[in-house]
Curated annotation (Swiss-Prot):
Gene name tied to this protein: Pym
Residue span of region Disordered: 1-27, 118-142
Family note: Belongs to the pym family.
Location within or outside the cell: Cytoplasm; Nucleus
UniProt protein name: Partner of Y14 and mago
Described function: Regulator of the exon junction complex (EJC), a multiprotein complex that associates immediately upstream of the exon-exon junction on mRNAs and serves as a positional landmarks for the intron exon structure of genes and directs post-transcriptional processes in the cytoplasm such as mRNA export, nonsense-mediated mRNA decay (NMD) or translation.
Main location: cytoplasm
Length: 193
C-alpha cells in the first residue's frame, strides 16, 4: 500500500489532493475531494468474520484444545528428543542419496545416434505413376489430369496473348509435363473402356 495522501486546503477551505508526478514524468491534476472521502489506497481490506475471529485468537490452537494440554505435549516431545536408546550413542539420520547414472546424457545420445541408420531418399521412377494410377480410382485420376491439362492450356494462352511475359520456374515445369499428362489421359481412357 502507498503512504497516506497529504491533503491541502485552498482559500475557500475545501480539501484537495495536490498535483503529483507520474513515473513517466507527466503530472496529475490536483483533485478536489468532498468531506469524508477516503482514497482507495487507504480503504482497509475486507475481512470476513471468520478471518477476523482467527486473527483474534492469538494462540493459534484448535478449538477445544486448552493451553495446558499443549504444554504437556511439548514437554513429552522435548523429553523424547533428549532420551537416547543407548547411552553415549549418537544417532544421525542419513538422507537417501540418489544413485548416479553411469551413463551420462551425452553418452546416451551418442549411443542412440550410432544405432540409427541413414538412408538416401530414392527418386521416384517412371513406374511409380503407373502404380498410382492402378491404386486410385481411374475416373478420379482422369478428372484430375484433365484439370491439370486445362491449367496448362490456360498458361499457354496467357503467354501467347502477352499477359504473362516471363513464366515462373513452376509454371515452366507445369508446361513441360503436358505431353506426360496427355499420355496418361490416353492410357486411362483405354483402361476405362
Amino acid at each position: 500500500m502507498s503512504t497516506p495522501t497529504a491533503y491541502e486546503h485552498d482559500a475557500d477551505g475545501s480539501k484537495f489532493i495536490p498535483a503529483t508526478q507520474r513515473p513517466d514524468g507527466t503530472w496529475r491534476k490536483p483533485r478536489r475531494i468532498k468531506e469524508g472521502y477516503v482514497p482507495q489506497e487507504e480503504v482497509p481490506l475486507y475481512e470476513s468474520k471468520g478471518k477476523q475471529f482467527r486473527a483474534r485468537q492469538n494462540d493459534g490452537l484448535p478449538v477445544g484444545l486448552t493451553p495446558e494440554i499443549v504444554a504437556q505435549a511439548q514437554k513429552k516431545k522435548g523429553q523424547r528428543s533428549t532420551i537416547q536408546p543407548i547411552p553415549g550413542m549418537i544417532i544421525t539420520v542419513e538422507k537417501k542419496k540418489k544413485k548416479k547414472k553411469t551413463v551420462t546424457g551425452v553418452e546416451e545420445a551418442a549411443e542412440k545416434l550410432a544405432k540409427c541408420e541413414i538412408q538416401e531418399p530414392t527418386l521416384p521412377s517412371q513406374s511409380v505413376p503407373t502404380e498410382s494410377i492402378s491404386q486410385s480410382d481411374p475416373t478420379k485420376r482422369l478428372k484430375n489430369l484433365r484439370k491439370k491439362l486445362r491449367e496448362i492450356e490456360f498458361l499457354e494462352e496467357k503467354i501467347k496473348a502477352g499477359l504473362l511475359k516471363s513464366p515462373d520456374k513452376d509454371q515452366k515445369e507445369k508446361m513441360s509435363k503436358k505431353n506426360e499428362i496427355l499420355n496418361e489421359i490416353d492410357i486411362l481412357k483405354n483402361s476405362i473402356l
